[in-house]
Design a protein with these regions (language model features):
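ATP-dependent adenylation/pyrophosphate-handling site
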Residues: 1-17
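ATP/NTP-dependent adenylation/nucleotidyl-transfer catalytic domains that generate, transfer
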Residues: 4-5, 20, 24-37, 43, ...
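A generic local structural motif
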Residues: 63-65
């Protein structure tokens, strides 16, 4: 579901889709170009121009699309978030890539996800690719957005004495609103 995707990121996605289809006979590949939808969305909301808002809107448009495809196929939406992203630092878009029905790898650190990929025979090109959400026009990757590598985040999450622990806590604090239950107003009877 490319939305104004950087060519190298899109090409890598196509490589992975091709590998999946060849390896697993039950995989269907659907290329859904989302540029027109996003362009219309951006034009309607042009007076509310905000780069970060548009990046998150891309994730939310993808989520809505995934739920439509799932509904049409009597299916569910499967998440791709890992423990560092989902529970460590909240590195996902609320109601975007965080909007899923099940999250099978959410208890795995990123290093475990890479290890699992190798075990399953996933191409090293894909495993070694710089992680990115693909939501930014400039092609920024996860490390650039987070300011830390996944290896450093994992170490900091597991060890309060790690030199990056405070930085990890700062990132986490900024995103707790995504990981905590939605605040509600309660009334006494």
């Amino acid at each position: 579901m490319p939305i104004k995707q950087i060519k190298s990121q899109h090409d890598l996605s196509l490589t992975h889709a091709k590998w999946l289809k060849q390896k697993y006979k039950n995989v269907e590949h659907h290329l859904l170009e989302m540029d027109k939808i996003f362009n219309s969305f951006s034009q309607v909301l042009n007076k509310f121009d905000n780069e970060h808002g548009y990046a998150n809107s891309r994730a939310r448009l993808r989520m809505a699309t995934l739920y439509q495809v799932a509904a049409a196929n009597n299916g569910i939406v499967v998440g791709t978030g890992n423990k560092v992203e989902d529970f460590g630092v909240g590195f996902y878009t609320k109601y975007g890539d965080g909007g899923v029905d099940i999250s099978p790898i959410a208890d795995c650190n990123k290093s475990q996800v890479w290890e699992l990929g190798r075990h399953l025979g996933v191409s090293e090109e894909i495993i070694n690719a710089q992680p990115t959400d693909g939501l930014w026009n400039d092609g920024r990757n996860d490390v650039e957005q987070l300011g830390m590598s996944y290896a450093d985040l994992e170490k900091a999450m597991e060890n309060k004495d790690d030199p990056n622990y405070q930085k990890y806590l700062e990132i986490r604090e900024k995103n707790l609103h995504k990981m905590n239950p939605i605040p509600v107003c309660t009334f006494n009877e």
